[in-house]
């Protein structure tokens, strides 16, 4: 029997994730919001003067959007090894090779249509061989060189307060650093691919419309293994945000799909539940670690900010075409049947079975997993808590009973 495949707007999903990554960069590296999308826009504008089109153009856009995909992993591991490290200075001194290594490994989870080997690995290399891996321009993939130039241009451009002076300053900067930081081909592609007018649209949100006009957003059909790889890629980014929830998203994804299969859902719905579980906490990327990892009870203001994460999940995933089901299953996991949940205060008649399932699975996973400040509860104790919550009108009693049966087999 042929297994149905899930259709996904992978470029849109990469764009949505880039927003979450930008939140991390803004927190730790002082990069302005929508950095990933601006890098993608500059990159694809340069691409037409480098004979890049079709599938290759789409792959370049995805690489640009996700060029710093391992930043949360790098920061997490650095802080664990060196608790007193100054992350901002560590990154600004070009100690970037590890996040490039991690990012290159991570990106292999994404199903590209062309060869993007070493693109993320070498996206901080200099044309003259003075970058982290000492590669010269002819040893560096073209995509890497384009993304490197676009990355630097965006960071420097946003550091100049006077918007009217940015274009002239950038053009002068590129000319001064041609054949040193940047190769001639990429500098020429920037000068031909962008005008002052097209560059200045980066000041507002109009560049996003232009980005999606240039880049094809054709949906791709994924089999179960590919869907799982894509979901795990994004879950890993989310879970590295905080050491308190190191495997939470993947755990929710695994159990949500297991429960869906147990309840008789078709293969596409099971895949969608896995993806929704992997993405359910992507909004936490917009919440500071001082709140996520606070050892004491949160203040009312801090708890309000914490609750915003599901609203951010809804907002972030709304960027993906034809993703409404997965978005809602992911974003409504803190809603309650009695209408006292968040972010929207939905009531029982507004929450479908999949949304109720995700709420129960999230609670189950949170209670059973070990965290730095607590030991995970047993299956039986957790199910007793779920039953109590269902009796109080918070969650679905039938799903709570099914979880006791289904997860009791694990």
Show the residue positions of the predicted features:
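Histidine- and acidic-residue-rich, metal-dependent catalytic cores
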Residues: 2-410
């Amino acid at each position: 029997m042929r297994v149905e495949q899930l259709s996904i707007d992978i470029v849109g999903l990469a764009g949505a994730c880039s927003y979450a990554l930008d939140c991390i960069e803004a927190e730790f590296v002082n990069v302005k919001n929508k950095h990933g999308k601006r890098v993608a826009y500059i990159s694809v504008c340069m691409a037409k003067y480098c004979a890049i089109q079709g599938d290759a153009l789409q792959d370049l856009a995805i690489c640009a959007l996700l060029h710093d995909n391992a930043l949360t992993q790098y920061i997490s591991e650095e802080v664990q090894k060196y608790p007193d490290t100054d992350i901002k200075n560590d990154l600004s001194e070009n100690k970037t090779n590890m996040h490039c290594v991690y990012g290159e490994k991570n990106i292999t989870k994404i199903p590209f249509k062309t060869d993007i080997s070493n693109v993320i690995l070498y996206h901080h290399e200099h044309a003259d061989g003075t970058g982290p891996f000492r590669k010269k321009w002819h040893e560096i993939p073209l995509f890497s060189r384009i993304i490197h130039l676009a990355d630097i241009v965006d960071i420097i451009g946003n550091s100049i307060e006077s918007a009217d002076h940015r274009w002239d300053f950038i053009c002068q900067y590129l000319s001064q650093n041609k054949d040193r930081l940047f190769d001639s081909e990429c500098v020429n592609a920037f000068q031909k691919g962008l005008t002052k007018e097209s560059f200045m649209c980066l000041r507002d949100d109009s560049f996003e419309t232009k980005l999606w006009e240039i880049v094809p957003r054709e949906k791709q059909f994924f089999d179960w293994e590919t869907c799982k790889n894509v979901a795990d890629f994004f879950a890993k980014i989310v879970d590295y945000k905080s050491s308190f929830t190191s495997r939470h998203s993947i755990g929710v994804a695994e159990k949500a799909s297991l429960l869906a299969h147990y309840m008789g859902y078709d293969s596409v719905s099971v895949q969608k539940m896995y993806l929704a579980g992997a993405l359910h906490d992507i909004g936490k990327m917009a919440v500071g670690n001082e709140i996520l990892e606070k050892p004491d009870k949160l203040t009312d203001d801090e708890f309000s900010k914490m609750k915003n994460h599901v609203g951010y999940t809804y907002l972030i995933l709304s960027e993906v075409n034809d993703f409404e089901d997965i978005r809602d299953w992911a974003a409504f996991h803190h809603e309650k049947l009695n209408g006292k949940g968040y972010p929207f205060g939905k009531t029982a008649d507004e929450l479908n079975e999949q949304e109720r399932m995700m709420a129960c699975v999230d609670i189950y996973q949170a209670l059973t997993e070990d965290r730095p400040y607590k030991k995970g509860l047993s299956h039986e104790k957790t199910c007793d808590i779920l039953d109590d919550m269902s009796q109080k009108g918070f969650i679905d009693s039938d799903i709570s009973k099914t979880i006791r049966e289904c997860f009791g087999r694990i």
